[in-house]
């Protein structure tokens, strides 16, 4: 006869087997369930059956190479993927403490609550699984530096230089001395008196202060001479002779015609 503790453990094992059903047929065939005469042997058999039930895929009878992988091997293989966890679709919580629906159904058994759960193992597995994700993010950041949008590297545009006198210094240096003299002689500047120029400058300065517009007078197109506006075809040609000489010439021509 067994001791009372042994009878209690046998009753627990019977209830456990009743809930499991046909899936536990291979659990009886294991070497751990061979010795059921002592309480330690019964506990070893129950732990072995619990480990078999922790697998998320069903146990198929047949050869050993067709059976699913164990939990430790599955975790090792799945850490190499991006999703990093097996059966994450079935998770209901963000903290990772709650597993899929199959594991939740197994954990609801009152018999399994008597033994220590594998929460500590899952927490250690989560910590080990977070490290490959950090490495993958670091590798991705390193690889994106080689692209244009990862870290833009390019030439900076040169700023446009604005000279106060309106003439670039390089343009004057590009021409030799003789060509610069010829250009200065060929340019037609408007003939303006100094007094009028000073008065005009004062008026224009007052206007620029009021209106805020800047008028360029140092270019030819700033204030061209009147005789050259519109190409010269809008202004009448002026004769160099005065009016009195014109009248005299007209009278002399008329007298010559009458005399003839």
Curated annotation (Swiss-Prot):
PTM (free text): Specific enzymatic cleavages at paired basic residues yield the different active peptides.
GO CC annotations, alphabetized: extracellular space; secretory granule
GO biological process: one example: neuropeptide signaling pathway
Chain positions with Phenylalanine amide modification: 86
UniProt key word Transport: no
Main location: secreted
One term of GO molecular function: hormone activity
Cellular compartment(s): Secreted
List of glycosylated residues: 90
Signal peptide positions on this chain: 1-25
InterPro entries noted in UniProt: Mcrtin_ACTH_cent, Melanocortin_N, Opioid_neuropept, PMOC, POMC-derived_peptides
Propeptide: 104-138
Similarity remark: Belongs to the POMC family.
Name the record gives this protein: Pro-opiomelanocortin B
Organism: Xenopus laevis (African clawed frog)
């Amino acid at each position: 006869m067994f001791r009372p503790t042994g009878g209690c453990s046998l009753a627990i094992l019977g209830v456990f087997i009743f809930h499991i059903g046909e899936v536990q047929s291979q659990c009886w065939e294991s070497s751990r369930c061979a010795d059921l005469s002592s309480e330690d042997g019964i506990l070893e058999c129950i732990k072995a059956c619990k480990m078999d039930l922790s697998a998320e895929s069903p146990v198929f009878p047949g050869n050993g190479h067709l059976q699913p992988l164990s939990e430790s091997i599955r975790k090792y293989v799945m850490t190499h993927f991006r999703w990093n966890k097996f059966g994450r679709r079935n998770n209901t919580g963000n903290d990772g403490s709650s597993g899929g629906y199959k594991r939740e159904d197994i954990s609801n058994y009152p018999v399994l609550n008597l033994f220590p759960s594998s929460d500590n193992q899952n927490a250690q597995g989560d910590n080990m699984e977070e490290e490959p994700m950090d490495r993958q993010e670091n590798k991705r950041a390193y690889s994106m530096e080689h692209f244009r949008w990862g870290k833009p590297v390019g030439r900076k545009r040169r700023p446009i230089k604005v000279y106060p006198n309106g003439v670039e210094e390089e343009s004057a240096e590009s021409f030799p001395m003789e060509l610069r003299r010829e250009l200065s002689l060929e340019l037609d500047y408007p003939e303006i008196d100094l007094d009028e120029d000073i008065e005009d400058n004062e008026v224009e300065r007052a206007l620029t202060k009021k209106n805020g517009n800047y008028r360029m007078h140092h270019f030819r197109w700033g204030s061209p001479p009147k005789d050259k506006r519109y190409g010269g075809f809008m202004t009448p040609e002026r004769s160099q002779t005065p009016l009195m000489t014109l009248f005299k010439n007209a009278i002399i021509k008329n007298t010559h015609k009458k005399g003839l």
